[in-house]
Amino acid sequence: MEDMAYSVEIDRKWQKIWEETKLYKFNPENVDKKLYCLEMFPYPSGAKLHIGHWYNYGPTDSWARMKRMQGYEVFHPMGFDAFGLPAENYAIKTGIHPYDSTMENIRTMERQLREMGVTFDWDYEIITCLPEYYKWTQWIFLKLYEAGLAYRKKAPVNWCPSCQTVLANEQVIDGKCERCGTEVTKKELTQWFFKITAYAEELLEKLDDLDWPEKTKMMQRNWIGKSEGAEIEFKIDGKDLSFRVFTTRADTLFGATYVVLAPEHELVDLITTEEYKEAVEEYKEYAKKQSEIERLSTEKEKTGVFTGAYAIHPLTGEKLPIWIADYVLVTYGTGCVMGVPGHDERDYEFATKYNLPIKRVIKGVGDVDDSLPFVEYGILVNSEEFTGMTSEEARVKIVEKLKAEGKAEFKVNYRMRDWLVSRQRYWGAPIPIIHCERCGIVPVPEEDLPVLLPYDVEFEPTGESPLKKHAGFMNVTCPKCGGPALRDPDTLDTFVDSSWYYLRYPDNKNDKEPFNKEWINKMLPVDKYVGGAEHATMHLLYSRFITKVLRDLGYLNFDEPFLSLVHQGTILGPDGSRMSKSRGNVISPDDYIKQYGSDVFRLYLMFGFSYSEGGPWSDEGIKAIARFVNRVERFIEKFIETRQNPGKTKEEMEDAEKELNYVRHYTIKHVTLDADKFEFNTAIARIMELVNALYKYENEVEVKNMKFYEDVVRDFVKILAPFAPHFSEEMWERLGYEYSVFNQKWPEWDEKALERDMIEIAIQVNGKVRSKAQVPSNATDEELKQIALSDERVKSYLDGKEIKKVIIVKNRLVNIVVN
């Protein structure tokens, strides 16, 4: 391969010029044309920028550059999600303070991000671990507290004995801590929660209006998990106690033969008889070690123990044995379920294992297989006065009867729980609450924010919050009574920091408020948000919740933070498996960029993969892109020579010009439309076709229309520019055009140029292509029929046969159907 002039030196040259000329500075005066483009901000880990960062930021930047050329005032900020467990664990291992390691990593990553040539406007940077940011994270906590949306309660939490901290459900993978792989246990702790369940219905409803991937919307729908049913009361035999079960199938109530409580349910200790106490205690210990995900697994064999107590069936008065089982969660519904083994697979499995009675109360309609367990709707049997009703009718009528007796009510239930936001760790934003023996819970007054995270802290994990041991931090005067009090020793989950960061970027220097209300309502919502699908049920849900809360508190006038969402796929190792150091298949962007320049790397990421899917890395693929860039460079040199010594020229648009013009406008149209859908691989394929057409015109047309030719070359460099920014800027300069290609208007396609005078159609006989013909694009159906029938190559297939019909697909084909 010939040496290219394009290299890393060209990258550095243009990055310096862009920086000096402030090419990408956002102009607040043009807010009416704003387009807010945002990628999920990175965690500042110690390693260099990896391929995942590149795949997120490079292609999105290309889209943003195109939008800028289309006349949008693009707001494209960047920052760092800088609190969190990794820096603290690193500190425990190395003794380097989390603040120091985090800030050093940020400086490294800033430099690397600049070297990517991405159009971030660094004036708007935010870093979540700095007091000027977390002051406002604490302010948001206080606003939720004032609104009754932040509260404390005792809760069984996932506890990692090794990390010595609470884990969210999502951080427990197969019963183990996702960070260190230790088996997770359960622990009762008083924790802070945000009441996200208060917004469950709106979070569900508004999903329909969002331009988000359907799969992500479905994940949120399932996570919120709305079910409409009823709560039915069961009294406990021989005691003045009762409990409620939530069910969506009240029509099966007559089939209940036992009830199950969650092992953690508060009634368990009150109702267990002496004979069964030991077994119940043992089982409770066993259940503690299971994660919720394991407990709900359909593969897992169902287990449980009898408490010795009985409940009274609310309709029949029968005694039903009360069991405890780990497949019932105290945090879902009421923590109690009725066992209807005839009509529920899980209950059937449980009843069969423990020899509990199984009753049929629903039969199928028509010839369906209604062998037990029969879980579909049907007709009620063995159900007293409700026998003969349909399931749909009975599930309402049965509840109405019980409601009249004060034993039931209709109820909507959600699977989603409130968001646990407190962490027993050091490296996070302190919770702005004071505990006073006299006054109870006292919020820190706004004027005293931020509650600063002290630097000199022992953060070795002991199971208690590290801040608890820091007397200077903990001891404080109560703002209400002036007496001695203690600060809350916990810190906020890092997902709280990232649940509002998109609101801070446009007003990141504001020290009076988190953001100016008037300004933020002009700048938001985010128009295009790009990041990993793994955040579907955490960050993306939390951000929607916080936006809605701030709207209801009067700070925002929009409902949703991110109008349009794109997920990038994953680039795998060359062996097709996920990249990991242990597999030795990690691709380091730096090595390739040194060799080829960042634009070749960027182009390969966009051309070699479907953006939302990703796929395995290929060295051959990046070499092919390097050859393509080289080919473009050679073409530009050739064109410059031709322009200097054109020989004989013309002004007419003849067939060769019309053909090149067609490819030009076809390319502009499809690059514009495909890039807008983040289908970069097909957009770049169209650009490659235009390069072929330019070479053809250069090499085969003796007398050229130089004015037209130059226009096409200009358009070509403009549409290549977002995808290969440094290289295109260099070519633009070499062509002698004024700086910068990114200040040019994005080309528009002309539909007229896409209408060809002559087009090629296929001629088929009985659906098989037998010939092709050049025909006028405006030919009538009758003319097309005659052209097809008189085609020499087709005639032999028609000899002696009866023509039944002729099918014409305009501009595509003629199909002659014969006997």
Curated annotation (Swiss-Prot):
Gene3D superfamilies listed in its UniProt record: 3.10.20.590, HUPs, Isoleucyl-tRNA Synthetase, Domain 1
GO terms classed as biological process: leucyl-tRNA aminoacylation
Domain of life: Bacteria
Catalytic activity: tRNA(Leu) + L-leucine + ATP = L-leucyl-tRNA(Leu) + AMP + diphosphate
The keyword Cell membrane is assigned to this record: no
Annotated motif 'KMSKS' region, positions: 578-582
Cited CDD domains: Anticodon_Ia_Leu_BEm, LeuRS_core
Keyword field: Aminoacyl-tRNA synthetase, ATP-binding, Cytoplasm, Ligase, Nucleotide-binding, Protein biosynthesis
A GO term, aspect molecular function: leucine-tRNA ligase activity
GO cellular component, one term: cytosol
NCBIfam families noted in UniProt: leuS_bact (TIGR00396)
The name this protein goes by in its record: Leucine--tRNA ligase
Protein species of origin: Caldanaerobacter subterraneus subsp. tengcongensis (strain DSM 15242 / JCM 11007 / NBRC 100824 / MB4)
